[in-house]
């Protein structure tokens, strides 16, 4: 499959991670590490297990609208949690952001994406109809994922930390 995508599944061991061939073709080894660690986070935090419990409620007509909203809310948080674990494990916010961008917009567009493009994404994400659309999505908008990586990098990549000095003898 030429699309860049990956997913984890399994209710019990053995769990599985699927990488589409597009991911293997277009991502570097380090970018693949980000994607694999992200998917491992879904396994570690049992996100696939939660899906098994949510799905029966989504089939009940009266509950399905509210259930879809709750499910989308939970899935978006699960994606941010998996992104955060990839950041914490790999310790490189730029690598994590670059990987997410490449998977979301494709390898060619990712190379030319700059701050102006990111500002445009932020602007369009904040429009009322996009806010509404986001409430039923199972993945956060890319700009939200990138801003969360920026937020958490301060925890993972402390800047200007004074070096510990050994006490004088």
Region locations from a protein language model:
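Peri-catalytic and regulatory segments of divalent metal-dependent proteins
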Residues: 1-36, 40, 44-45
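Catalytic Zn2+-binding segment of zinc metalloproteases
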Residues: 40-56
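Hydrophobic, aromatic-rich membrane-embedded alpha-helical segments
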Residues: 52-69
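An active-site-proximal "capping" alpha-helix that borders the catalytic cofactor pocket
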Residues: 33, 75-96
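Active-site-proximal gating segments in proteases and membrane effectors
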Residues: 1-16, 66-67, 87-169
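Generic anion/oxyanion-binding catalytic loop in active/binding sites
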Residues: 21, 71, 134
């Amino acid at each position: 499959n030429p699309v860049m995508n990956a997913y984890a599944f399994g209710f019990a061991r053995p769990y599985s991670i699927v990488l589409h061939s597009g991911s293997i073709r277009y991502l570097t080894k380090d970018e693949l590490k980000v994607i694999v660690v992200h998917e491992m986070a879904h396994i570690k935090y049992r996100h696939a297990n939660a899906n098994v419990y949510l799905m029966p409620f989504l089939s009940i007509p009266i509950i399905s609208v509210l259930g879809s909203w709750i499910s989308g809310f939970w899935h978006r948080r699960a994606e941010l949690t998996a992104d955060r674990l990839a950041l914490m494990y790999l310790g490189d916010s730029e690598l994590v952001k670059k990987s997410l961008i490449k998977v979301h917009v494709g390898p060619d567009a990712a190379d030319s994406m700059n701050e102006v493009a990111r500002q445009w994404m932020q602007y369009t994400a904040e429009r009322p109809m996009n806010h509404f659309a986001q409430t039923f999505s199972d993945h956060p908008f890319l700009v939200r994922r990138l801003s969360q990586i920026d937020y958490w990098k301060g925890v993972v990549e402390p800047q200007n930390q004074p070096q510990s000095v050994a006490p004088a003898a």
